[in-house]
């Protein structure tokens, strides 16, 4: 039955209780009998500062090329229509006080789910434990926070359907709510101003506070300055830290406006501030003068804003750690001393820089009272300063496409668009390296770039590089060239213009690419130095390539690359590498080739619709230069009956895959490999991961194995942490390792997000926000089960020895029993049939125990709500799993092993060995448990065929000979090979671990 509102409010925090009150008011206003999840969504979308509202607006801005307000309005309409469909209750005229509509069972179930999720969340695990210990006398009720309340509401099937009708995905909304981007808390401010509406005469007055202000190029006020002023006027967290590539420009605009006496954008209570700028690098150069500098700052007048500039130097290794720590502590003490009259302001170019700063100084945001302020756009925009028509849309917005898409000239693009944080870091590294050693490019920085981005140094310039340290003018003359170089690289590659060039018509490939059973294609080339086998999925074409007219459709594609002349002289140094690379001008802008490369390389390509494979560092040079054939032979020997899967895995791991298929929107070079192993054969998948650990990581000590099925069991490894937390801790201790993740489809939503993020960025983030580098790590993720299409034929015939029975075989001792033939004929067959019948009954009971049951103690509504919740969670997991499999470096499907055929071969070999000792006239009975044990040992052995033959000759054959000696020649007898259920097998001490070390003769 429904729950009273007062009872439900006791389980919520103040913020969540206010959201529930808004939902109750919506239900009361519509005269609904109960308060449901839809009412809660309606109330959250109405609140101006709601997390759900900001996330939806931010997600709409990223998903649609149109106005984000239109899609958000569509969501509001869908919610309103769904609420209109709910029946209204008729209030009695005798009631004088209107009662609150009680909380429905579905909404109360969402609150309970929120409590469970929040209780087991690692971030609050220790806090709940301390809270429970301090309140032992009273029963403590876990207060549900608003974030977890929203996550549970989004799991409601009705809410998911409404969001889907409006063009949203509940999984995306949950992702943004659980791990919001840096800009999420301000999305309601800048998203509405990122698109300037049409200019009407009625829009010109700015008396309405909620109206968007137009950022005219000649205006005195700047939107970013106004936002900075709002932060400075706060009581807490009043020191803004500008985050973004445009943060430096916004900071400069703010300081220039203050210095010119323009305070119109500041609130009245802080009007009249003064700005004092300091350069952190100059202060840190002489550590002894830090105290003197801060003494001077302490004597300044009140109302001062201390401009710290770019804070990247605090996270770098240029200066001593002790000096930087002293500087940070001095600033914190200065702020505590003059809290009411002193402000800080600074900027970082990217979120990564801020995370590095937090990693080095975890409490700097509290000590400096920082407030993150994202700067997503420049005040100038993409329009020239002299153009008023840049923000004007003719005909009242009827032709809005002209304002949404403008093609700026190349000169304006070069002036207004800054470099991205990656190119900016590379530029600064080159400047630092050139200033220190006189080298134009740092070797470590250059090796991380593809060969077509490496700078070319002419020979006649080498003599002038030694003058850098002596003459500072040389460095000053080099800096503009470096700036132009990286501006060109960034704008050509990382910053795509609004329209492509008219001379280039993008066309997507019209043919599917497949590899075996994994939807991939092989491209084979000539000799070992010219052979490249490339794997590519159909979704790998993130960029668009120009195709020739009427390309021939071929199922198998071959590409031949002629061997350059200069590589013949270097053949001795390249024989160990299975790859040969060529440099091709892809029309991406200025090409910077390496020094040892010739300007042109002859290339003969039969199919021009493939991109040329580029060089990439994977794990290490020696690691991925392993011979493909050697790895394939090793895996084939250790993992039998999976030849196609072994070939595909060897190709992927050895680097025979398409470089452009790496993570979407992933610029930085990652050197980890992600494999997805689908289908059955659990033992074969694990043996593949163990073999990769032996080959690439030096042994099984660097093998990390986790199972998402065991996260709910009593496993000490996961106490107080999640599976991803355990993986992050192990990878931090063992950098070069193979991570084997079983049943990845069982991962919970937070772990799903972290795994997807680690695959994109190359860094695994635990539940506490710490990032662990996944460099030099091979991740092998398995998915239980297999495709339905590939398993349809398996269900046609009953299977006697299934994979589940084989892997669950007991570790019983094998025995050879000698019995009189008469007794065997009387008792043997009946007893054997009885034992087999008992085994079938046990398996049938186990199957029945796994079926769902009906709990009569639960109301019908709650059972239906739980079923809907389970269905929604399963649907969300399937969607994430499909995306996860498509993003990995390679997916390989294992086929089902015919254990029945293997059992026949095992029986045939045992009988042949038996007849050598007893003769063909003697009968041997073999129990099913014996076959199951041998099958399990055979599948888990390192070298299946060799190990089984060795066990037959060294263990079973001597036992048969010993049994033959005990037999009485005159009396008729029969021999049984059984598995003793009384005594389990002891730990093996021989080299054959899985097979029994001895077979008893009774």
Curated annotation (Swiss-Prot):
It is found in: Nucleus. Ubiquitinated upon strigolactone treatment. Strigolactone, but not karrikin, triggers rapid SCF(MAX2)-dependent degradation. Induction: Up-regulated by strigolactone treatment. Residues 8-185 form the Clp R domain. The keyword Ubl conjugation applies. Disruption phenotype: No visible phenotype. Suppresses max2 phenotypes associated with strigolactone-D14-regulated growth. Smxl7 and max2 double mutants have reduced branching and increased inflorescence heights compared with max2 mutants. InterPro entries: ATPase_AAA_core, Clp_N_dom_sf, Clp_R_dom, P-loop_NTPase, SL_signaling_regulator. Pfam families: AAA_2. PROSITE patterns: CLP_R (PS51903). It comes from the Eukaryota. GO terms for cellular component: nucleus. CDD domains: RecA-like_ClpB_Hsp104-like (cd19499). The keyword ATP-binding does not apply. Expressed in axillary branches and roots. Detected in seedlings and leaves. Expressed in the primary rosette buds and expanding leaves of adult rosettes, the vasculature of the hypocotyls, cotyledons, and mature roots, and in the midvein and petioles of young leaves. One of its GO terms (molecular function) is ATP hydrolysis activity. A motif (EAR) lies at residues 854-858. Residues 12-86 are annotated as: Repeat 1. Keywords: Nucleus, Repeat, Transcription, Transcription regulation, Ubl conjugation. Contains 1 EAR motif required for the interaction with TPR2. Belongs to the ClpA/ClpB family. Probable component of a transcriptional corepressor complex involved in branching control. Regulates cotyledon expansion and lateral root growth, but not germination or hypocotyl elongation. Promotes auxin transport and PIN1 accumulation in the stem and represses BRC1/TCP18 expression in axillary buds. This is Protein SMAX1-LIKE 7.
């Amino acid at each position: 039955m429904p729950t009273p509102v007062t009872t439900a409010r006791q389980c919520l925090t103040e913020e969540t209780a206010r959201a529930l009150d808004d939902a109750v008011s919506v239900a009361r206003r519509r005269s609904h009998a109960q308060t449901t999840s839809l009412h809660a969504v309606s109330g959250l979308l109405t609140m101006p500062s709601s997390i759900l509202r900001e996330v939806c607006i931010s997600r709409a801005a990223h998903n649609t090329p149109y106005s984000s307000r239109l899609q958000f309005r569509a969501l509001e309409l869908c919610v309103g229509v769904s609420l209109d469909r709910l029946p209204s209750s008729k209030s009695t005229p005798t009631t004088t006080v209107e009662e609150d509509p009680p909380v429905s069972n579905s909404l109360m179930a969402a609150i309970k789910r929120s409590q469970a999720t929040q209780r087991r969340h690692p971030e609050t695990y220790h806090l709940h434990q301390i809270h429970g210990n301090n309140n032992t006398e009273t029963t403590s009720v876990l207060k549900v926070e608003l974030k977890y309340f929203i996550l549970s509401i989004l799991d409601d099937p009705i809410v998911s359907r409404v969001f889907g009708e409006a063009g949203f995905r509940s999984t995306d909304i949950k992702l943004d709510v659980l791990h919001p981007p840096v800009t999420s808390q301000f999305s309601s401010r800048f998203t509405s101003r990122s698109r300037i509406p049409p200019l009407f005469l009625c829009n010109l007055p700015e008396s309405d506070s909620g109206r968007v202000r137009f950022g005219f190029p000649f205006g005195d006020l700047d939107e970013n300055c106004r936002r900075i002023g709002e932060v400075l006027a706060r009581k807490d967290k009043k020191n803004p830290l500008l985050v973004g590539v445009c943060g430096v420009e916004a900071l400069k605009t703010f300081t220039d406006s203050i210095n010119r006496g323009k305070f119109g954008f500041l609130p009245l209570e802080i009007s009249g501030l003064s700005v004092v700028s300091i350069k952190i690098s100059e202060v840190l150069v002489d550590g002894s003068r830090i105290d003197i500098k801060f003494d001077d700052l302490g004597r300044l007048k009140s109302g001062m804003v201390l401009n710290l500039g770019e804070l990247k130097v605090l996270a770098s290794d240029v200066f001593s750690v002790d000096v930087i720590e002293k500087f940070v502590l001095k600033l914190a003490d200065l702020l505590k001393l003059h809290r009411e009259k002193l402000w800080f302001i600074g900027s970082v170019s990217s979120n990564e820089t801020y995370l590095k700063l937090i990693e080095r100084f975890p409490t700097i945001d509290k000590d400096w009272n920082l407030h993150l302020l994202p700067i997503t756009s420049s005040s100038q925009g993409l329009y020239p300063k002299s153009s008023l028509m840049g923000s004007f849309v003719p005909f009242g917005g009827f032709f809005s496409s002209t304002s949404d898409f403008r093609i700026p000239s190349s000169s304006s693009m070069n002036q207004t668009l800054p470099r991205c944080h990656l190119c900016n870091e590379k530029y600064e590294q080159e400047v630092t390296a050139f200033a220190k050693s006189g080298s134009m490019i740092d070797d470590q920085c250059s090796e991380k770039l593809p060969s077509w981005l490496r700078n070319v140094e002419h020979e006649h310039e080498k003599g002038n590089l030694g003058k850098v340290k002596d003459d500072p003018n040389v460095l000053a003359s080099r800096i503009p060239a470096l700036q132009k170089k990286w501006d060109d690289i960034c704008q050509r590659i990382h910053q795509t213009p609004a329209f492509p060039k008219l001379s280039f018509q993008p066309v997507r490939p019209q043919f599917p690419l497949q590899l075996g059973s994994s939807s991939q294609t092989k491209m084979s080339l000539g000799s070992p130095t010219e052979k490249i086998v490339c794997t590519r999925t159909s979704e790998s074409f993130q960029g668009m390539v120009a195709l020739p007219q009427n390309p021939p459709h071929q199922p198998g594609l071959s590409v031949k690359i002629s061997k350059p002349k200069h590589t013949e002289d270097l053949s001795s140094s390249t024989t160990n590498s299975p790859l040969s690379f060529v440099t091709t001008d892809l029309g991406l802008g200025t090409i910077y080739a390496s020094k040892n490369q010739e300007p042109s390389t002859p290339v003969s390509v039969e199919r021009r619709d493939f991109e040329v494979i580029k060089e990439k560092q994977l794990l290490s040079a020696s690691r991925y230069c392993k011979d493909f054939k050697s790895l394939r032979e090793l895996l084939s020997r250790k993992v039998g009956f999976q030849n196609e899967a072994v070939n595909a895995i060897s190709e992927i791991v050895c680097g025979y895959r398409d470089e452009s298929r790496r993570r979407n929107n992933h610029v930085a070079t990652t050197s980890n490999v992600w494999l997805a192993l689908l289908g059955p054969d659990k033992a074969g998948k694990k043996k593949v991961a163990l073999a990769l650990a032996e080959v690439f990581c030096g042994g099984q000590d660097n093998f990390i194995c986790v199972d998402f099925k065991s996260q709910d069991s009593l496993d000490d490894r996961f106490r107080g942490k999640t599976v991803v937390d355990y993986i992050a801790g192990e990878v931090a201790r063992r950098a070069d390792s193979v991570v084997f993740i079983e049943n990845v489809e069982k991962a919970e939503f937070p772990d799903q997000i972290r795994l997807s993020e680690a695959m994109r960025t190359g860094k695994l983030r635990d539940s506490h926000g710490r990032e662990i580098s996944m460099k030099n790590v091979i991740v092998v993720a398995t998915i239980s089960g297999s495709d339905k299409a590939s398993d349809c034929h398996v269900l046609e015939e009953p299977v006697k020895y299934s994979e589940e029975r084989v892997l669950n075989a007991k570790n019983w001792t094998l025995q050879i029993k000698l019995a009189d033939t008469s007794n065997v004929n009387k008792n043997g067959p009946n007893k054997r049939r009885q034992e087999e019948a008992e085994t079938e009954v046990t398996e049938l009971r186990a199957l029945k125990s796994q079926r769902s049951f009906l709990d009569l103690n639960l109301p019908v509504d709650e059972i239906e709500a739980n079923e809907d919740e389970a269905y929604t969670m399963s649907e969300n997991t399937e969607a994430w799993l499909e995306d996860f499999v498509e993003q990995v470096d390679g997916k390989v499907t294992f086929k089902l092993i015919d254990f029945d055929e293997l059992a026949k071969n095992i029986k045939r070999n045992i009988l042949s060995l038996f007849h050598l000792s007893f003769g063909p006239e003697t009968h041997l009975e073999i129990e099913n448990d014996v076959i199951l044990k041998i099958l399990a040992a055979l599948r888990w052995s390192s070298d299946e065929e060799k190990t089984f033959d060795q066990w037959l000759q060294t263990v079973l054959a001597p036992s048969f000979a010993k049994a033959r000696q005990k037999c009485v020649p005159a009396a008729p007898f029969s021999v049984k090979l059984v598995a003793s259920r009384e005594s389990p097998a002891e730990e093996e001490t021989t080299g054959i671990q899985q097979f029994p070390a001895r077979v008893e003769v009774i």
